[in-house]
Structure formats: C-alpha cells, structure tokens
Amino acid sequence: MTITQLEYVVAVATYKSFVSAAEKCFVTQPTLSMQIQKLEEDLGIRLFDRTKHPIAITEMGEGIVEQAKNILAECEKITELVQAQQEKLSGVFRFAVIPTVAPYILPKLLDQYAAAYPEVKLHASELETDQIILALSNGELDAGIVSTPLEEKHIREYPLFYEPFVAYFAADEPALKKRLILPSDISLERIWLLSEGHCMRNQVLDLCSDHVEGLQSGRPYRYESSHVETLRKMVDNSGGLTVLPELATHEFPEDYMERIRYFEEPMPVREVGIITTDHFVRMALLQSLMDEVSKLIPESMRVQKKGRKVLRIQSAKL
C-alpha cells in the first residue's frame, strides 16, 4: 500500500470516474486503474463497483475511502508543520469566497496579497457555502470566506468582520420618507431576493421573520437572482426594494445612495468569517490572508458592537 494508491482511491471516490480521477492526478487512466487494482488485490476486496455509472463505492470500500482521506490529511500535515515552524510563507494557498462577498474584496485582495507575499501563490475561486464545505472536506481547498457561524462538524471558524445590511428602494417607495427603517418596512410582496442556496437569502428572511407571508405576491411574476447587482437593477427597472450588504454600496453614485436606508438598532449584520477544516495547521498563511482582508474592510465593521444583531444563516421559512 502506498500514498499514491490512496490518492488515486480518493480521487476516484470524489469524481466517480476513473478518467476524471486520472486527469486530476495527472496520470494516464491505465496507470491509475492498475494501481487501484493492485491495492484491491492486496486488500482482498473491491473498493469500487465498476458496473455502475457513475462509479460507485462498495460497502467495504466506504470505510477504506474515509480512512484514506484521513491518512492523506495527516501526511499533508508533515509539510505544513515544517513550514509553520520555519514561519516561511510560501507555496500554494487555495481558498474560495461566497458570491455575496467576492466582488467586494477579491479584486483588490489578490494584487494586494501578491505584493505583500510574493512567494505565496493564491488560487482563488467563487463558490457557494455548501460547495466550499465539500471542497474543504475533499482536500480541494485550504480555506473559505463565508457567512458564519455555521457550526459545522470538523470546521473551524475565524470571524473577520460584521457587515450591516441596508435596504435599497425604488424612488416611489414610502419607506424613503424615513431616515432609519424597521424590518416591518421591508415589504415581502415587492422584495427582490437572492435564489435558494445563498446564505444571504435566509438572513433576509430571518430579518423579516414576523411577516414572511406573501413573498413577491405584489407582482405578476416571481424572480430570484444569483447576483446582488441584479437585485439592484430589478429595483431600478421594476420597482420595489431589495436588501444589500453594505460593501455592495461603497461604489454607488450619489443618486443611488439617496435610496439607501439603514435599519434602526439593533442593526442587522452578517458575520463574515474564514473557515478551515479542524486539521488545518498552516496558521501563519491563514493569518496573513486574514490580515490582508482586514485592511480592505472599514474599521467600523471589524468588531461586533452593541446595537447590532447577527442574522441567522439557517432559516426554516420559505
């Protein structure tokens, strides 16, 4: 049994295909198949049911695959521990950011980080929270920037900042007459929401928890978007309102800002944090990323303050 064989096993289990696994491992498919077959012969069991499409893990193979993942994670720790003790910031660091945060930090963060740490190669991507958690567990990512708290098993969380939510109204909405608004001013009949799968959608529904009936019933069609900027454009073109993270407004022109309203205390905020698996040890690299993100965030958001309410991510409503 070799580490390489275990890597091939985990790859096939992840991608459910010998061809895709070979591509990800940068070897030919016959080479990968031969090594897995040799391991199966040594163990005296079949790890995969090759008659099914996609490839399925056998009942005996399930436990072997999980143990292989654990062994590979422990092997990776050896290199990481050496780097941590040497305090040498180098190598590849793979992280992903959720779509409602990425546009407001990634463009500046990547160049800023590269200038500060030229020996570290960042691999950044944009994924939804569930995809980030899966990629972390599969060893495809080192960290993720998401809305927290998640309270997921085997996931560690490190808060980064607390971002207020604001409301953006069409020019004819009566709530614009107020300086500060209440959650009851958010009409779910006329709201534009992110689609299911986005944490921010659940947070907005949590904000309006006392009156969730009649979602988008005030118009002849229902539309939900995957992009915050699209929500703003729907308000501009079709009226109504939406709820935005404050960072999304920082480059708004003055006429857009006139239609932004903040909430009365307790001001609704989202906690944004960085997450890793519980076996991650490259803490110096993680801290360097956290430090660079912090430089991009207004000081007022860096700590949780009185008069703010962190909205829940999980919501049973709608």
Which residue ranges define each predicted feature?
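Secondary-structure junction motif
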Residues: R190-E213, R282-D291, I297-L311
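Hydrophobic hinge/microswitch elements
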Residues: E128-L141, V146-S147, G197-I260, G307, ...
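Central regulatory/effector-binding core of bacterial HTH transcription factors
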Residues: S90-K153, S217, E224-H227
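Beta-alpha-beta core module
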Residues: E152-P159, E163, K178-R179, D185, ...
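Hydrophobic two-helix hairpin corresponding to the core of helix-turn-helix DNA-binding domains
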Residues: V9, A21-A22, T58, Y113
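Alpha-helical linker/hinge and terminal dimerization helices associated
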Residues: D42-L43, I64-Q86, L289, V293
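A short LG(V/I)-centered, amphipathic sequence patch enriched
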Residues: E40-E59, T79
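Short helix-boundary/capping micro-motifs
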Residues: V10-T28
